[in-house]
Amino acid sequence: MDFSRNLYDIGEQLDSEDLASLKFLSLDYIPQRKQEPIKDALMLFQRLQEKRMLEESNLSFLKELLFRINRLDLLITYLNTRKEEMERELQTPGRAQISAYRVMLYQISEEVSRSELRSFKFLLQEEISKCKLDDDMNLLDIFIEMEKRVILGEGKLDILKRVCAQINKSLLKIINDYEEFSKERSSSLEGSPDEFSNGEELCGVMTISDSPREQDSESQTLDKVYQMKSKPRGYCLIINNHNFAKAREKVPKLHSIRDRNGTHLDAGALTTTFEELHFEIKPHDDCTVEQIYEILKIYQLMDHSNMDCFICCILSHGDKGIIYGTDGQEAPIYELTSQFTGLKCPSLAGKPKVFFIQACQGDNYQKGIPVETDSEEQPYLEMDLSSPQTRYIPDEADFLLGMATVNNCVSYRNPAEGTWYIQSLCQSLRERCPRGDDILTILTEVNYEVSNKDDKKNMGKQMPQPTFTLRKKLVFPSD
């Protein structure tokens, strides 16, 4: 069943109370003023899509919403996710996208009876005028009104506690549990990065193009270095797709997609480079999407306890946010990287998971000074286009993704030389790893080298962009 049909079917089965709950739990992403026009679940889904909180390749927020409002039937039927899976997922720190504060308020609203709701309104008359507390207001509406008046917030729970104590002391336990959780979380986040062995920090996804101020705020977590002593350091998968005859035959929109001539040069460069850096190379050529998932599943289930790192390189065609298998089927990049979260691959928890992706993803040019492209008209260079704000890696520590290009811009492949990105990456790794440079320093140099190349025919340029949630410096010793 396709993505839109799934959302439609889910929306049709959510009543007005469900919608009110979903809107409340989404307040940190869609402000109350912008929620006012939302009259049904489909409109809410549309707003979430606009905020990039709901995508075909990333249903985690929708799953969490349905789990929180206890619509487990929809979770199982349409999203193929069981309650136990969600419980395990949300127990991993940093994975929950709905704040503990908002979940706490929602839990209170679920425990308050109609008579207690009337008492709630009566006891708040000093803080909120009676005309605002009309008969139709539910407790979630009251919480929103309290937040507007700044008498309720993550650090403002006194009035709520006073009212709950008068109405039903069991409600206080929900608040106390939240406060205890907040204290534990605060104290744990003040600890050393070494205290987290399985990606358990609350971490944001960063890119090298983030502002200096944002990077400075994270710099302390990079002061230490990931352990890199095992030999081999880890597995290095190289999924190298060249022959797209199946795609041309089976997928009408890809009838003119070209074979990726020259990709063997990239695969060879990656093999030589990472062998020198003591990785065990695992090559896989001309893989369908199903085969790619099967390969990743094999390495997800492997025991990496004696390894210090994992690398996966994918060389293929693609489109916005996805890569193509040789059969023309699509694999969302986020789904590929997410195969190696701490929950799915515990033996890699706390260890760096590195992905390098060279994939043709469109036909737009980044304007600059004027090489040719491996599109239908040009036989030489491949064009990569990424979707704006597309999510590529999990919101979990220890991931790094090197994409060949920034959003909405092409990348280039020369059949006689390989791609600008992979060739520059391998050259920089071979030159700078023996000096002890860390991977972000190296990728910054790759950005510089690639950005100085010109596509003179199309006036195009290319700028790679890494995205990462690394907690420490990542160095690949050559000795």
Curated annotation (Swiss-Prot):
GO molecular function per UniProt: cysteine-type endopeptidase activity; cysteine-type peptidase activity; death effector domain binding; death receptor binding; identical protein binding; peptidase activity; protein-containing complex binding; scaffold protein binding
UniProt-reported outcome of changing S387A: Impaired CDK1-mediated phosphorylation and enhanced apoptosis
Modified residues annotated as (Microbial infection) ADP-riboxanated arginine in this record: R413
DED domain location: 2-80, 100-177
Subcellular location: Cytoplasm; Nucleus; Cell projection, Lamellipodium
Variant or mutagenesis effect after changing D73A: Abolishes binding to FLASH. Induces NF-kappa-B activation
Site entry: Cleavage: D216, S217, D374, S375, D384, L385
Reactions that this protein is recorded to catalyse: Strict requirement for Asp at position P1 and has a preferred cleavage sequence of (Leu/Asp/Val)-Glu-Thr-Asp-|-(Gly/Ser/Ala)
Hydrolase found in the keyword field: yes
N6-acetyllysine PTM sites in chain numbering: K224
Any GO BP annotation: positive regulation of cell migration
Protein name as it appears in the record: Caspase-8
Gene: CASP8
